[in-house]
């Protein structure tokens, strides 16, 4: 069976912002494809800088075989601290597809990745652990033909709050869409 991986991303700038606060980076190694989504705190230029730094650091470190512990520690020490909020903050989701057979998902503070299997949203096991004071969610999923993963920042579930949707766009609605 010949299996291939298709990856696409779409980002929308927040209203009246020149840059998007979300960044996606794709890194290829000899045995894996690594997709990284990051959302920087705030919006516009500041958020873009934070998310770009996060994806670049994670991409470089993971490509070089570093552990997720080392990655999280490096991000915590590297991101510039916001003068207003006094924190350095960026969310991330990593999807590492190894040999087109296994997906490893590592998530920090983004909405959980949606797995569509045979056109239906399905649950998958998630293990939680704390690294450098941050709760990291990890999953390892054996792949099946035509599996679809949907990773998103909090911009998706928060879309339309108070306008089209009173309470935002629910995860199950996003999966159905």
What do the predicted segments below correspond to?
Residues 17-30, 123-161:
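Acidic loop->beta-strand submotif enriched in PP2C/PPM serine/threonine phosphatases
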Residues 28-31, 35, 46:
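Membrane-embedded alpha-helical signal segments
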Residues 36, 107, 149-151:
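Residue-level marker for buried hydrophobic side chains located in beta-strands
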């Amino acid at each position: 069976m010949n299996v291939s991986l298709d990856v696409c991303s779409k980002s929308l700038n927040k209203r009246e912002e020149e840059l998007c606060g979300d960044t996606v980076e794709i890194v290829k190694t000899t045995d894996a494809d690594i997709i990284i989504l990051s959302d920087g705190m705030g919006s516009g230029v500041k958020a873009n800088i934070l998310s770009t730094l996060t994806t670049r650091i994670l991409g470089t470190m993971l490509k070089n075989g570093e552990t997720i512990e080392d990655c999280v520690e490096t991000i915590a020490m590297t991101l510039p601290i916001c003068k207003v909020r006094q924190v350095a903050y960026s969310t991330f989701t990593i999807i590492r597809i190894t040999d087109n057979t296994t997906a490893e998902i590592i998530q920090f503070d983004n909405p959980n990745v949606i797995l569509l299997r045979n056109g239906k949203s399905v649950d998958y096991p998630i293990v939680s652990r704390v690294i450098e004071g941050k709760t990291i969610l990890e999953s390892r999923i054996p792949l099946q033909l035509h599996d679809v993963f949907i990773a998103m920042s909090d911009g998706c579930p928060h879309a339309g709050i108070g306008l089209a949707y009173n309470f935002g766009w629910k995860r199950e609605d996003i999966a159905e869409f």
